[in-house]
Amino acid sequence: MSEFIAENRGADAITRPNWSAVFSVAFCVACLIIVEFLPVSLLTPMAQDLGISEGVAGQSVTVTAFVAMFASLFITQTIQATDRRYVVILFAVLLTLSCLLVSFANSFSLLLIGRACLGLALGGFWAMSASLTMRLVPPRTVPKALSVIFGAVSIALVIAAPLGSFLGELIGWRNVFNAAAAMGVLCIFWIIKSLPSLPGEPSHQKQNTFRLLQRPGVMAGMIAIFMSFAGQFAFFTYIRPVYMNLAGFGVDGLTLVLLSFGIASFVGTSLSSFILKRSVKLALAGAPFVLALSALVLTLWGSDKIVATGVAIIWGLTFALIPVGWSTWITRSLADQAEKAGSIQVAVIQLANTCGAAIGGYALDNIGLTSPLMLSGTLMLLTALLVTAKVKMKKS
């Protein structure tokens, strides 16, 4: 695809950035992220309304990640010759449809169908977002355009959980998803208005992505990515029942905790470049080790609200290093195939999200309240050990 983008640049002779299109892509990414994480803050009322356990309701996160995993791997190959403008419009339609299906769901099955639609849009859009952005601006402006995209992601991660918790208490969880559907409609119209025609990739340029896994250290890196994100979702998906039952937070208190977590994540993302300049490998090993210790502290002393709040802030600050760190690892260690490596990374992350949420939900329902924390801490510790022992890092 990178060669195709280069050729396309030459043919189209992009001389000025299309900022309206860039911001429309950023807005769509932000909406997808917000809707992906809404169930985290609405898990309890959703479960009560549908007559299911919180662990089962958490599988609405699982199915989204599961479908997104396959979408990220295969959708760009399936739609090679299709104009990307129409594909992005389709993703925005799927986002809107997902929100409406969830808001009107009267059964767990319909809820899962709605969340599967979101997974298709999420995985496909994430797999294409960077290459889309690169085709909307001149080469010299690509870093700035990408910063807009990832800035939107950071903002979405900050506001998604606390906004969902606050609005859920105010207007009910179904109306929260109705409001998200309205955002989806805005996405559709903005994309139609601003996104130009973007021809698809010629079929003769199709290459085997999975051969990258045969390179030294790459498989170990992908396993480490899997364990770190599975550990994150095993904990974060069930943060509401854990914090409300273990630490005794009410809805208002939980909203503040989630807001603190989101702000800490934003700060961590902002500071990550300074930390990664010193040592990427140290950051990739040190961050999950700190998270493993945090999970242990929360398991032992999480009934204290101050301790629980402190752990949430430390978790947000520390985990923010992990996605940025692994992206940096790809650009350094797999620079010649960064786009394909990024596609595998997205799929691995979505698979990890699926497994983490699924196993965490099973543990919550069948083992106990702190079991998702113990699972998360164990995975984070294993990640730190694997990175230290096996992951290779090329110097910049």
Swiss-Prot record:
GO terms for molecular function: antiporter activity; purine nucleoside transmembrane transporter activity. The keyword Hydrolase does not apply. It catalyses: inosine(in) + H(+)(out) = inosine(out) + H(+)(in); guanosine(in) + H(+)(out) = guanosine(out) + H(+)(in). PROSITE patterns: MFS (PS50850). GO terms for cellular component: plasma membrane. Gene3D superfamilies: MFS general substrate transporter like domains. Pfam families: MFS_1 (PF07690). This is Purine ribonucleoside efflux pump NepI. Keywords: Antiport, Cell inner membrane, Cell membrane, Membrane, Transmembrane, Transmembrane helix, Transport. It is a multi-pass membrane protein. Involved in the efflux of purine ribonucleosides, such as inosine and guanosine. The keyword Transmembrane helix applies. HAMAP family: MFS_NepI. It is found in: Cell inner membrane. Residues 43-54, 107, 169-175, 237-255, 303-305, 365-366 are periplasmic. The lineage of its organism: Bacteria, Pseudomonadati, Pseudomonadota, Gammaproteobacteria, Enterobacterales. The chain crosses the membrane at residues 22-42, 55-75, 86-106, 108-128, 148-168, 176-196, 216-236, 256-276, 282-302, 306-326, 344-364, 367-387. Belongs to the major facilitator superfamily. DHA1 family. NepI (TC 2.A.1.2.26) subfamily. Its main location: membrane. Residues 1-21, 76-85, 129-147, 197-215, 277-281, 327-343, 388-396 are cytoplasmic. It comes from the Bacteria. It comes from Escherichia coli O1:K1 / APEC. InterPro entries: MFS (IPR011701), MFS_dom (IPR020846), MFS_Efflux_Transporters (IPR050189), MFS_NepI (IPR023680), MFS_trans_sf (IPR036259). Signal peptide: none annotated.
